[in-house]
Design a protein with these regions (language model features):
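An amphipathic alpha-helix/rod signature
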Residues: 72, 271-272
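Conserved C-terminal RecA-like helicase domain
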Residues: 52-201
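Signature of the SF2 helicase/ATPase Hel1-core->accessory helical subdomain module
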Residues: 1-52, 61, 206-271
Length: 272
């Protein structure tokens, strides 16, 4: 991050009162974090020698989705069954990457890939996962037409799943509906037919979004800046019910570099 100020203290000097991540957890205002640093790449190379392209490959993406679909049952409270499961966000580095994950997940559910949703998961939650993608589409972006074509398909899938009627002309309304569905603060979202399990994002929803039933953040990208890491982590650790004990973070790239980045971020924002 170079010499840029990373904390409020560095930017503005002494604060009248500090209330840190550590204090909030200690006071029981929020839950603690459990971070699981995973890696899909088996290689004799040192971590820093592994090329970025290794994490672009379809096999890596399938491993990530297998982990989400079949190896996160406890984090997502899936054994509790219909209506009781938690939700997750998958964050990736770019819109094309988010689109690729969306398409691959559809392909898995269509039975076209080696990864399947396990029978054990289906026993608890037959329609898992219900998912979508959300990002802001700007008409000024160069690739905007391609983004909009994909988002049109996403909205059609979403409308079919939830009986809504969104179109590209109402992207704001769609994004608001995704927010509300993920937040589950209205009674109608207590019913399984109105619930989402997973939302794929780049940066949207990673700051300021409050959804107590969101338990897990899956990260398939390089470590973010310290303040962005803490903000993103903090989507997961809102107090919800007596089964949710932690906010779960699962990373899939460069585990050593990620651990260093997280340790640094927690040190910066917890007074050590």
């Amino acid at each position: 991050v170079g010499d840029l100020a990373q904390t409020t203290h560095q930017q503005y000097g002494d604060r009248l009162h500090e209330y840190t991540v550590k204090e909030a957890i200690h006071d029981g205002a929020v839950l603690g974090f459990k971070v699981d640093y995973r890696n899909t790449i088996i290689s004799d190379l040192l971590e820093e020698e592994i090329p970025d392209q290794a994490y672009e490959d379809k096999e890596h993406m399938l491993e990530v989705l297998d982990a989400i679909l079949n190896k996160s049952q406890q984090q997502l409270n899936i054994p509790k069954g219909v209506g009781k499961s938690y939700e997750a966000i998958l964050t990736v580095k770019s819109i094309p990457r988010a689109q690729a994950y969306y398409n691959l997940l559809k392909s898995i559910l269509a039975g076209k890939e080696r990864v399947k949703v396990s029978e054990r998961v289906k026993r608890h939650l037959p329609d898992f996962p219900k998912f979508t993608i959300t990002y802001s589409v700007s008409e000024n972006e160069e690739e905007s037409i391609g983004y909009q074509d994909h988002m049109k398909q996403v909205m059609e899938d979403y409308n079919q799943e939830f009986g809504t009627h969104f179109s590209l002309a109402d992207l704001r309304g769609f994004n608001t509906d995704v927010n509300n569905r993920l937040a589950r603060k209205q009674d109608k979202y207590l019913y399984r037919n109105e619930q989402l399990d997973l939302v794929i994002v780049v940066d949207r929803l990673l700051t300021g979004f409050d959804a107590p039933c969101l338990s897990t953040l899956f990260i398939d990208r390089k470590p973010m800046r310290p303040q962005d890491l803490i903000q993103a982590f903090s989507r997961t650790n809102r107090i919800f019910d007596d089964k949710k004990h932690f906010g779960h973070i699962i990373t899939f790239q460069r585990p050593q570099a990620f651990k260093e980045a997280v340790d640094n971020a927690l040190k910066l924002y917890s007074n050590g």
